[in-house]
Curated annotation (Swiss-Prot):
Subunit (UniProt): Monomer.
The record's note on its domains: ValRS has two distinct active sites: one for aminoacylation and one for editing. The misactivated threonine is translocated from the active site to the editing site. The C-terminal coiled-coil domain is crucial for aminoacylation activity.
GO biological-process terms attached to the record: valyl-tRNA aminoacylation
Gene3D superfamilies, alphabetized: HUPs, Isoleucyl-tRNA Synthetase, Domain 1, Valyl-tRNA synthetase, C-terminal domain, Valyl/Leucyl/Isoleucyl-tRNA synthetase, editing domain
Molecular function (Gene Ontology), one example: ATP binding
Enzyme class per UniProt: ligase
Protein name: Valine--tRNA ligase
Coiled-coil blocks: 842-910
EC annotation from Swiss-Prot or TrEMBL: 6.1.1.9
């Protein structure tokens, strides 16, 4: 007999151990002979990471699919692993050194510092893997990989050297996102925009050959900027070619204030005639758009910042070129050189004002890009870096999605994928860090570069080049973390070696990931997979949405609305969290997570536990020779039919990535049909004297529960595994753990039995609804009058008389020609069901109560409708607040409809 309650905290570790002992998650476990492979690679979490709600959703979805396909007998591999997370890991260890008052990395030296990171990884790096196991992730943990382990490092070397020799990796001077605190280039995903209240400064740039007069607008052009310090690097002013105001000036120069550099006025579509003066200052070395304008118009790129974002003028050859070093300019150079960018901004504005070049200052709120780890504003920065020719690699990656070899689900993301791929920029893959894959490039005395897999090979190449042995210096940069991640689908399977795993599991079946890394990871895996394997890395990409708080707001520490999945698992168990995420994971829709929902789905687990316990108390046990088609009782044939339908819906839902529909189908069958109705129908049979009926009911209930455990296992693996082991045939053990049991393939359906019992369910539900709407006391027993019933309906009433009276609290059923006075009515098929209310409730008092309720609802609806009609409210309120009001309005409209129905019934009855 089951314990009275299910203890998730005590059971989950025990079940995890059972799976481990059974080897249930090993590649190929439980596979049928000759089965098709089903392979999934986990999006590797950062080694520094702790499980967050995004991980919980992502890995729940993967685990649902993996457990489902494993039970269907496929040859399953779920490949786990962890990302070395360059910047994040280096920062964690640097912080640890500072906290322990140990020498910093520079004092320690590169080699010792990297040793220290490996030591940290050995001590703390396994935390997220353990948290994923706790969630129930059924990966083949014996195959866990790390992006810096020896095998993957070999794959990275092979790819880098091959691409270099194919001319697809090269060194170039371009703009990058530069973090002046961490002193490295960072990727776009590591940049976050923050709304900052700042200013827009409007400056006067004097025209050449015209005496500058601040009072005469014909002597200057006005440009505006949010970053005045960058004007020191201006090399042009752009105007739109269609802007007639500037036609005569295009090709002439302006003189850069404070500096004296002559810079051309160029015609370029980038300039917007409607924005400000229509003229734009161009600083190619410090703005991504300006860099492109500069390339189109052959403008110089002058970098005026140090890596730390201080001004550099004194020894800056590019800045000083062609400048007349007047006393005024020398003084400016002395004053500004080495000054922090923000102090320089303030001083430059003062100087522009003093010399008549400041037109005006506007308050201006704008998005300022910050490094998400360094936390300071990043700078577009001109520097030498390593690049991948992504444009070339993108072509086959686009073709693979266009011709359907790889499908993106939901399909609407394909447009985003193509938009990005068609406009792809060279991919900057170098980082100025110590932790990561060091770039395999060595430089000779004259700077000649040798890219090889080892230092010995580089020395041999240098010897061949110079005709003698020379000293080589290795590039100190490391590769972007996304570079090694881009190889994940094949590097984890042993490439560049030709392994059996690679032959079996590549290409993988499906990739599950968030839409936010479609470009940073998915597209790059497509490029690398197609280039090196000459085959797509996955057949399907399933992109899930974000997990937000219950109001629809993005979770962030600053908002204080972060929901911790580990805390939720402590309180409700892993199954409740998983089921909640699954049933809310509608395609393309963000998950709005309310912890109250998780409590609700824990109750669902409790319902199943209690149903099993109730069944055991009534002698329900597996009958080995039970066959659905042999059941005789309509109620059993009905539940077996509904079980087949539910199985079909769950199977289709998972197979088509509609996890919410699959979970919903399982939920409705278990809670509504099996627990609320079927077990209720069985009570008189269990208490009766018909032993044959009792035995059939017991066997049917046991069979249904067995299938339910299987259907729910991908969603709620822990509880279902425990129930499976505790409900084996008397005196026997199960042949296998539930994780390796066979997925139900059911075909039994009895349309007549289903129609018959579903009619009974609809009748009782309808009568109960009317009673609830009319506030009929729960204990009151009411008569029922039936009008216009045909023979089938009359027979059904006769056949189910006892059940109707017991379940709907009905004292007698009569068939009449006319509705009695004071009766509420409902339609069921061709018949009208009348419930006389006069003796049960005070119709007048109930009408008054309903009118009052309708008034309250109408008033609140009016208030919300006015709010939503207010354009200022919709424009200025937080998105989640507006959404909450819209949702409340929908709820109120539904409530108003219910009250209107009840009022209509009262009127009819009166």
């Amino acid at each position: 007999m089951l314990e009275k309650t299910y203890d998730a905290a005590a059971t989950e570790p025990k079940i995890a151990e059972r799976w481990e002992e059974a080897g249930a998650f090993k590649a190929g476990a439980g596979a049928k002979p000759g089965a098709d492979p089903f392979a999934v690679v986990i999006p590797p979490p950062n080694v520094t990471g702790s499980l967050h709600m995004g991980h919980a959703l992502n890995n729940t979805i993967q685990d649902i699919m993996v457990r489902f396909e494993r039970m269907r007998g496929k040859n399953v591999l779920w490949q786990p692993g962890i990302d070395h997370a360059g910047i994040a890991t280096q920062m964690v260890v640097e912080r640890q050194l500072a906290e322990r008052k140990e020498p910093n990395r520079h004092a320690m030296g590169r080699e010792k510092f990297i040793e220290r990171i490996w030591q940290w990884k050995a001590e703390s790096g396994g935390m997220i893997s353990n948290q994923l196991r706790r969630l129930g992730a059924s990966c083949d943990w014996s195959r866990e990989r790390f992006t810096m382990d020896e095998g993957l490092s070999r794959a990275v070397l092979e790819v880098f050297v091959t691409l270099y020799k194919q001319g697809l990796i090269y060194r170039d001077k371009r703009l990058v996102n530069w973090d002046p605190k961490l002193l490295t280039a960072i990727s776009d995903i590591e940049v976050e925009s923050r709304e900052i209240k700042g200013h827009l400064w409007h400056f006067r740039y004097p025209l050449e050959n015209v005496p500058f007069d601040p009072e005469n607008p014909h002597t200057y052009i006005i440009v505006a900027t949010t970053r005045p310090e960058t004007m020191l690097g201006d090399t042009g002013v752009a105007v739109n070619p269609k802007d007639e105001r500037y036609h005569a000036l295009v090709g002439n120069d302006v003189i850069l204030p404070l500096v004296g550099r002559h810079i051309p006025i160029v015609a370029d579509d980038y300039a917007d005639p409607e924005a400000g003066s229509g003229a734009v200052k161009i600083t190619p070395a410090h703005d991504f758009n300006d860099f492109e304008v500069g390339k189109r118009n052959n403008l110089r790129a002058i970098n005026i910042l140090t890596p730390e974002a201080a001004i550099t003028l004194k020894d800056n050859v590019d800045f000083l070129e062609d400048l007349e070093l007047t006393a005024e300019l020398k003084a400016l150079i002395v004053e500004l050189d080495g000054m922090d960018r923000f102090a320089a901004r303030k001083r430059i504005v003062e100087l522009m004002d003093e010399r008549g070049y400041l037109e005006k200052i506007d308050d201006h709120t704008h998005a300022v890009p910050h490094g998400d780890r360094g936390g300071v504003p990043i700078e577009p920065y001109l520097t030498d870096q390593w690049y991948v020719n992504a444009g070339e690699l993108a072509k086959p990656a686009m073709a693979a999605v266009r011709d359907g070899r790889t499908q993106i689900v939901p399909k609407n993301w394909e447009k985003t994928y193509f938009d990005w791929m068609e406009n792809i920029q060279p991919w900057c893959v170098s980082r100025q860090l110590w932790w990561g894959h060091q770039i395999p490039a060595w430089y000779g005395p004259d700077g000649h570069c040798f890219v090889e897999k080892s230092e010995a090979e580089a020395k041999a190449a240098a010897r061949a080049h110079y005709g003698e042995d020379v000293a080589l210096e290795r590039d100190t940069d490391v590769l972007d973390t996304w570079f090694s991640s881009a190889l994940w689908p094949f590097s984890t399977l042993g490439w560049p070696d030709k392994t059996p795993e690679l032959a079996t599991y590549y290409p993988t079946s499906v990739l599950v990931t968030g839409f936010d890394i479609l470009f940073f990871w998915v597209a790059r895996m497509m490029m690398m997979g197609l280039h090196f394997m000459e085959e797509i890395p996955f057949h399907t990409v399933y992109l899930h949405a974000l997990v937000r708080d219950k109001h629809g707001a993005k979770m962030s520490k600053s908002k204080g609305n972060v929901i911790d999945p580990l805390e939720l698992m402590d309180e409700y168990g892993a199954d409740a969290l998983r089921f909640t995420l699954a049933i809310m994971a509608a395609q393309g829709r963000d998950v709005k997570l309310d912890p109250a929902r998780i409590a609700g789905y824990r109750n669902f687990g409790t319902k199943l536990w209690n149903a099993t316990r109730f069944a055991q108390m009534n002698g329900v046990k597996l009958a080995p020779d039970f066959r659905p088609e042999n059941a005789k009782l309509a109620v059993n044939r009905w539940i077996l039919t509904e079980l087949t339908r539910a199985t079909r819906a769950v199977t289709e839902g998972i197979a088509t990535y509609r996890f919410n529909e699959a979970a919903g189908a399982a939920y409705r069958f278990v809670w509504n049909q099996f627990c609320d109705w079927y077990l209720e129908f069985l009570k008189p049979i269990f208490m009766g004297d018909d032993e044959a009926a009792k035995a059939e009911a017991q066997a049917t209930a046991a069979y249904c529960l067995d299938q339910v455990y299987k259907l729910l296992h991908p969603f709620m693996p822990f509880m279902t595994e425990e129930l499976w082991s505790l409900t084996a045939s008397e005196g026997k053990k199960r042949d296998t753990v539930l994780a390796l049991a066979e997925w139900p393939e059911l075909s039994f359906e009895d349309e007549d039995a289903a129609a018959d019992i579903n009619w009974l369910v609809d009748l009782v539900t309808g009568i109960r609804s009317v009673r609830a709407e009319m506030n009929v006391p729960a204990g009151a027993i009411a008569p029922v009058v039936v009008l216009d019933a045909n023979k089938v309906t009359v027979d059904r009433f006769a056949r189910h008389d006892a059940a109707i009276k017991r379940l709907a609290r009905v004292e007698r059923i009569s068939f009449e020609q006319q509705a009695p006075k004071g009766a509420a009515q409902m339609l069921l098929g061709e018949a009208t069901i009348c419930i006389p209310l006069g003796s049960l409730i005070d119709l007048q008092a109930e009408a008054a109560r309903l009118a009052k309720e309708a008034g309250k609802i109408a008033a609140e609806m009016d208030r919300i409708e006015k709010k939503l009609a207010n354009e200022k409210f919709v424009a200025n309120a937080r998105e989640e607040v507006v959404e909450a009001e819209r949702e409340r309005l929908v709820e109120l409209k539904e409530a108003a409809q219910r009250v209107a129905t009840a009022e209509s019934r009262i009127r009819d009855a009166s």
